[in-house]
Amino acid sequence: HNYFLPQYFCIKFFFITRIMKIIGTGRSHPSLVVTNEMLSQILDTSDEWITSRTGIKERRIISSENLEDLAIDAAKKALADANMDAKDLDYIICANVVNEYVSPAMSCLIQGAIGAKCPCFDLNGACVGFIYSLEIAEAFYKSGKYKNILIVCAEEPSRMVNWHDRTASVLFGDGAA
């Protein structure tokens, strides 16, 4: 009789954690300032009512600028803050909802303007767009395939907000980061 003894293998798993970090930031906002006092002239509200509920004293609204320019400016500032060149980017993610164009995607406009040669896409995530973008960027980074990922969040809610609704209009401003 041949007896086969089970062989036991000791398998060790080693997990190497790749930690992603933010190495640069940039922001860009329109020049037009809309204060709570200005809103109180068209709404049944006051500076005190808005500030006590939101902490907001003013917001920026696009007038002579456009969202694309703000997004590109924020991207350039983030790259400069990170001491990085656009050619070093491995991916661009742009989180936004309100866009000037259906196509091309805002990320493609940013990519072309800064001279990047990497893949890019837009993510429509509304208020949580940055969080979703960060989670996707982390997954890309941990895959080992992408190292330098630019996330740009650009919004122009002033085009859609009901300026006669004091519960919503007091919350939103335009800009990019």
Residue positions per predicted region:
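Conserved catalytic cysteine-centered active-site region
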Residues: 51-53, 57-68, 96-148
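Conserved "HGTGT" condensation-loop signature of ketosynthase/thiolase-family condensing enzymes
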Residues: 10-90, 114-115
